[in-house]
């Protein structure tokens, strides 16, 4: 089961992010899936697509995600990843800078019967803001 769940996670990153196939979101995410991010919770694939995928693909082009490590135990899959992109749209209120951005993150997901039922994402939002030109690191640290 763990290997099949790892395959779901790898497919998620490859198709949803690298190939920009939004149809894969509904295919791999259960209708009642819950997503947890620093900006709140999403409910189901349409909500996740609108609040996460549309926001990121609208703000960044050339998104590429490399999966560096994947660990699975039963229905739990943890993925360590790194992403590169170009800031070409409004991101977190920061106008397009055309700058390259690189972030690291971790995704923890629960996969049941081949579909993602819950997920947690953690990534370097401060680093993203700095790279987009929204603040210098010194400004972020002084707050």
Question: For the regions a protein language model found, what residue spans apply to each?
Answer:
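A solvent-exposed, acidic/Ser-Thr-rich amphipathic alpha-helical stretch
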Residues: 22-77, 82-85
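Ligand-binding pocket scaffold of soluble enzyme catalytic domains
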Residues: 5, 20, 26, 37, ...
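Low-complexity, intrinsically disordered terminal/linker segments enriched in charged
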Residues: 117-143
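Exposed beta-sheet edge and beta->alpha loop/turn motif
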Residues: 86-112
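Short, low-complexity N-terminal intrinsically disordered segments enriched in polar/charged residues
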Residues: 1-31, 137-143
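Short, surface-exposed charged micro-motifs
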Residues: 69, 106-108, 120
């Amino acid at each position: 089961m763990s290997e099949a769940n790892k395959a779901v996670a790898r497919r998620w990153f490859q198709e949803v992010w690298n190939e920009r196939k939004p149809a894969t979101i509904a295919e791999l995410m259960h209708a009642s899936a819950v997503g947890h991010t620093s900006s709140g919770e999403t409910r189901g694939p349409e909500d996740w697509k609108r609040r996460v995928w549309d926001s990121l693909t609208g703000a960044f082009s050339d998104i590429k995600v490399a999966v560096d490590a994947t660990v699975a135990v039963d229905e739990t899959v943890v993925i360590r990843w790194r992403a590169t992109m170009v800031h070409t749209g409004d991101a977190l209120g920061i106008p397009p800078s055309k700058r390259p951005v690189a972030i690291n993150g971790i995704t923890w997901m629960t996969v049941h019967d081949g579909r993602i039922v819950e997920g947690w994402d953690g990534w370097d939002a401060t680093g993203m803001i700095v790279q987009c030109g929204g603040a210098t690191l010194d400004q972020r640290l002084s707050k």
